[in-house]
């Protein structure tokens, strides 16, 4: 059984994961309109992944005797000055999500809810991967600079990142 405090914190994380999905979806739309098909595909895949994270939390809350809440979402930013800015925003958001997960883990330890703590370890690991991937992408973007050929290759190569990442993901 979940305490009301942990249930509230998990419901907040459900909202954050849903907003993350919307953020990636908005980024996918922006990239697609700009002709960055590889980036758009990457963002669509990330949006779906964030939705899966949300669903995993929803099921956990409900299975543990809580009531998962679906709440109103903040509208994501839909325009960016450059694809570099878009990925900078992505990285900032992933750091925000990591901090939120860490706070949630802290609450579970304070309340001695070791089952929820154990469940959240998957999210901790996932966020390490998400931040590392965003940082790697930003490093590549910084290497490219204003080179149009580099942007073309990046757009093509990010599809490989999506394929290789998908093959190593947890199937839950």
Predicted feature descriptions by range:
Residues 1-172:
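Iron-associated oxidoreductase/ferritin-like identity signal
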């Amino acid at each position: 059984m979940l305490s009301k405090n942990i249930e509230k914190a998990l419901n907040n994380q459900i909202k954050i994961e849903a907003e993350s999905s919307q953020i990636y979806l908005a980024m996918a739309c922006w990239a697609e309109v700009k002709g960055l098909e590889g980036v758009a595909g990457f963002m669509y895949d990330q949006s779906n992944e964030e939705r899966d994270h949300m669903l995993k939390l929803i099921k956990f809350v409900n299975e543990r005797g809580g009531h998962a809440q679906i709440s109103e979402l903040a509208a994501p930013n839909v325009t960016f000055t450059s694809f570099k800015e878009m990925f900078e925003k992505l990285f900032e958001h992933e750091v925000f999500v990591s901090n939120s997960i860490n706070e949630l883990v802290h609450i579970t330890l304070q309340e001695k809810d070791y089952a929820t703590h154990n469940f959240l370890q998957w999210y901790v690991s996932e966020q390490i991967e998400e931040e590392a991937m965003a940082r790697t992408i930003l490093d590549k973007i910084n290497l490219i600079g204003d080179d149009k050929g580099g942007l073309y290759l990046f757009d093509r190569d990010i599809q490989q990142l999506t394929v290789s990442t998908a093959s190593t993901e947890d199937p839950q």
